[in-house]
A protein has these predicted regions:
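FIC/Doc superfamily catalytic core
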Residues: 1-126
Length: 126
């Protein structure tokens, strides 16, 4: 499985901000690391997020909800989630509007992790 490093997420965030605008500043490195490393947590020797879909959804959810960046949290969360899934062999079938809706829903608190995971599963390409 291809993992995303702190450096990769920071670079992707910079590229997104350059392309779409906003502040490139990092608010809290610990919140960023928590989002990135949290998907690999274990308890009693068992992964808390064992599937690629679970890891991807958790990564997207925590990047958005942790607010590690001054700006662009929704954009980086959804982009990293979708890219993580794709590089790990999971193709998605969703429109830009679908992605925007999911990102805004997570940010507003109307979509939790389990609901984002369901969204990922429902938008997986067949």
């Amino acid at each position: 499985m291809i993992r995303f490093s702190q450096e990769k997420v920071l670079l992707l965030h910079q590229l997104i901000i350059l392309e779409t605008g906003g502040s490139p500043e990092l608010r809290d490195i610990n919140l960023l690391n928590s989002a990135i490393e949290g998907v690999y947590q274990t308890f009693g020797g068992q992964e808390l997020y064992p599937t690629k879909e679970e890891k991807g959804a958790r990564l997207g959810y925590t990047l958005i909800s942790n607010h590690a960046f001054v700006d662009g949290n929704k954009r980086i969360g959804m982009y990293v989630m979708l890219t993580f899934l794709e590089v790990n062999g999971i193709r998605m079938d969703c429109t830009n509007e679908d992605v925007i809706f999911a990102g805004l829903s997570v940010a507003s608190g109307s979509m939790n992790y389990e609901q984002l995971l369901t969204w990922v599963r429902e938008h997986r390409a067949v």
